[in-house]
Amino acid sequence: MSLPEALELAASRAAGLRPVDGLLPHITGEDGRWELLSPLDAEDAALTGLPWTGGFVAGQLWLAGRHERAAAVTEVLAPRAGQPTTHDLGFLFWPSAVLGHLATGEPGYRELALRAAASLAERALPSGVIQVIGGLDDPEWRGRSIVDTWPNLMLLWWAEREGLAEAGRAARAHLAATLDAFLRPDGSTFHAGRFADDGTVLERGTVNGFAADSTWARGQAWAVHGLASASRATGDSELRAAAERAARWFLDQLPADGVPPWDFDAPAGPKDASAGAIVASALLDLGHEDEALRLLETLVATCLNRSEGDGLLLHCCYRHPVGLGLDCATVWGDFFLLDALVHAVEPATRPDPLREGARARAPSQPA
């Protein structure tokens, strides 16, 4: 299947997404159908944060030009914007409210996204670290951060351009506090860390990876995407070099079939194609078109869902250490694949939070 054909399929699949009684698609279950979550309730008993994936449902619909359904999903998410409870406000409101504003020009989406950005900036600690989840005065969570926060900063970079100066300050401070702690000299990454209020690194390890010192594939992908966005937003040559180093490490570690494993240091286990989609999107933003297209072509050839089941990008892995979603489709994998396909095939239609005047029209799609 060619990339234009894959884009057509992706837009068609995205068009079927919708909220069901306030619940949103998340990952597919063993039956190949979407499992639904409320974006307003805890995902499971072990997670003190709230579900982080709903924005990617809205984002797919905006990218596919299905504005009515995208608006419905964004409305479901809206109560979260004023709740400074998680670093995932970026994932919730960059693909939903920011892309909604870019797609429609509606000022309400801009206001919603700015409210979410202000809430996210409130999670900054004296060290500059944006705490992942938990109350800022909760000793269990104080100072904890994960590399997944870096791509969440997209919301803050956009908000800075919209005049919210504290958003840019928070994003820069977080990167200054965490960059050297998470990015190893060879370009690989730690997933998680904990920081004292003075910035001292107290511990490093993982939440979703194979081992404390392993490189979790999606964490590496989040690093590539977050650093690519940061370098574009700031023009900082050191951040650009860091993004390039992380991307090169990721590409150099890919197995012969070109599909990322769930963890680059795990002796065996499932794939995580979503990590490949995230990196493909970032590579296009970095201007590495040839490498991005090779990665996209591999994912389309080996992981694209051509059956009647739900989801687009198969062979993704959600939370391996707890046995959740070991071989599934995910709404984030589908979002980043669709985003990369739009960027590669019809770049003029892609809404880009970091490009001036980035209003978009819907990609070509069947009637």
Model regions and ranges:
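Glycan-recognition and catalytic cores of secretory/periplasmic carbohydrate-active enzymes
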Residues: M1-A367
